[in-house]
Amino acid sequence: MFVSPMLLHSIKEPFNDENYITELKFDGIRLILSKFDNQIKLYTRHNNEVTSKFPELMDLDIPDGTVLDGEVIVAASGGAPDFEAVMERFMSKKSAHNIVYCVFDVIYKDGQSIAAKPLTERKTVLNSLELDHPNVFVIEGTQGNGLAYFNLAKEKNLEGIVIKKANSPYEINKRSHNWLKVINYDYTEVLITGYTKKDIKFLLSYPDGTSAGFMEFMPHAERTKFHSMKQVKSESDEYVFIEPILCNVKHRFKTKHGKLRIPSFESWRV
């Protein structure tokens, strides 16, 4: 049984509030796990069934009529989630990466929806399931302490934190202001060296000329400014190449090949 997950709103700064539960944000793949008719099934947030991709979760001992929400990760040697590794595991049956299902919510119990119950009650239900499994980790969270948790995320080079209203219901298929995320962004100076003709993705490079990947996210006003500044050097069937323009971008770490992950425009350096 698939349940469309509750999604997060993004905010820029963490805060302390005892009316919220704070959790570390794990960089992985959102996964809904359900057990009905004594069959465990796994779904991505977009309702793609991926049960066969994670066979190690098939023996999880949970009552029939249960639906869990969580994130599948692969932990790197230092313990931090490795997004590239979990995607490699997701895409290839030959991958030997061990996964961990980090469970943070329960939506159905005994075949009945408990989505309307407050988060604190759902956390109690989650703990009562006693999910004792080598590939499962229950995220309990802590009351308040948003600032301290965000500093910990930065110290450990984690993706960020999630701050959830303690009395919030589980809002199925909705991006809610009751659940907030604060991303631990990195900031890097790069050059825009061109853009794609079809969907206007910007080509980025580092000052030494090596590729930094593509950037999709730039506010409309800044796109207008970009097009007024650009000086076209040459074109191909797919790309327009320009004289390099220096800018700052924010992003979620770098890939093993040095590319920026999900870069977005921050400011001009001209």
Curated annotation (Swiss-Prot):
GO terms for biological process: DNA recombination; DNA repair. Signal peptide: none annotated. The lineage of its organism: Bacteria, Bacillati, Bacillota, Bacilli, Bacillales. InterPro entries: ATP-dep_DNA_ligase, DNA_ligase_ATP-dep_cent. One of its GO terms (molecular function) is ATP binding. It comes from the Bacteria. Keywords: ATP-binding, Ligase, Nucleotide-binding. This is SPbeta prophage-derived DNA ligase-like protein LigB. Belongs to the ATP-dependent DNA ligase family. Pfam families: DNA_ligase_A_M. The keyword Cell membrane does not apply. The active site is at residue 25. SUPFAM superfamilies: DNA ligase/mRNA capping enzyme, catalytic domain. Gene3D superfamilies: 3.30.1490.70, DNA ligase/mRNA capping enzyme.
